């Protein structure tokens, strides 16, 4: 059966978007707010109608992720910021495999996310309450699966409890995208053997987005 590289690329961009947001948060203490909203909202939608629907139904919502994906796929340097993004992306993929193979872990994750949906009736998605709740899910359900993702950035920034919560919530969104990536036929071998297909697909999607003014 032929693989749907459009859906695979969208889901991969979702992982990369989380990686980029984590990097921004760790170095600057803040990140692209619109992209963060899209990523966090993807955690909540448990029954999407399509891959694109997970990310709000618009390709433009994944602009940050698509641009990051191109950087990761074509990274010639193993040092610096691109190396960080590649490490975060691959680490999220490894953790997703551990999540999917751990008995009962996906059920536990689903139950905890249902709890988030109830909280959303009273609190905003990016409120400290929701951020803390999503971070707690990451700490309780994902972190024990190991190995832990080492987030690098400004030590002063990373000491902030609010930034720590946002980073963990964003990593949870990355896990969500990695689960989706496997569901639509993604696999790590594609990063080696289908790099050109993924690059072409990402460029095609970006090409018909309206330019940012």
Curated annotation (Swiss-Prot):
It is a peripheral membrane protein. Residues 79-126 form a coiled coil. It comes from the Bacteria. It is found in: Cytoplasm; Cell inner membrane. InterPro entries: HflD, HflD-like_sf. It holds the Pfam family DUF489. One of its GO terms (cellular component) is plasma membrane. Keywords: Cell inner membrane, Cell membrane, Coiled coil, Cytoplasm, Membrane. Its main location: cytoplasm. HAMAP family: HflD_protein (MF_00695). Belongs to the HflD family. Negative regulator of phage lambda lysogenization. Contributes to the degradation of the phage regulatory protein CII. Acts probably by holding CII on the membrane surface, away from the target promoters, but close to the FtsH protease. Interacts with CII protein from phage lambda. PANTHER family: HIGH FREQUENCY LYSOGENIZATION PROTEIN HFLD. This is High frequency lysogenization protein HflD. It comes from Escherichia coli O45:K1 (strain S88 / ExPEC).
């Amino acid at each position: 059966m032929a693989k749907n590289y459009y859906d695979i690329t969208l889901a991969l961009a979702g992982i990369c978007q989380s990686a980029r947001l984590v990097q921004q948060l760790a170095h600057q203490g803040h990140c692209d707010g619109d992209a963060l909203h899209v990523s966090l909202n993807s955690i909540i939608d448990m029954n999407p109608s399509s891959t694109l629907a997970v990310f709000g139904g618009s390709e433009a919502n994944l602009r940050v992720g698509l641009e990051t994906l191109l950087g990761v796929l074509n990274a010639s340097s193993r040092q610096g910021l691109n190396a960080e993004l590649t490490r975060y992306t691959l680490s999220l993929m490894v953790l997703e495999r551990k999540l999917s193979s751990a008995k009962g872990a996906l059920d536990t994750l689903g139950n905890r996310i249902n709890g988030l949906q109830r909280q959303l009736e009273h609190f905003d998605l990016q409120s400290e309450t929701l951020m803390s709740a999503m971070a707690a899910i990451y700490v309780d359900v994902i972190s024990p699966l190991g190995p832990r993702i080492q987030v690098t950035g400004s030590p002063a920034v990373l000491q902030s409890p609010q930034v720590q919560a946002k980073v963990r919530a964003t990593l949870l969104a990355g896990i969500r995208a990695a689960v989706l990536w496997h569901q639509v036929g993604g696999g790590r071998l594609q990063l080696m053997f289908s790099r050109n297909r993924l690059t072409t697909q990402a460029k095609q999607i970006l090409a018909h987005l309206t330019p940012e003014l």
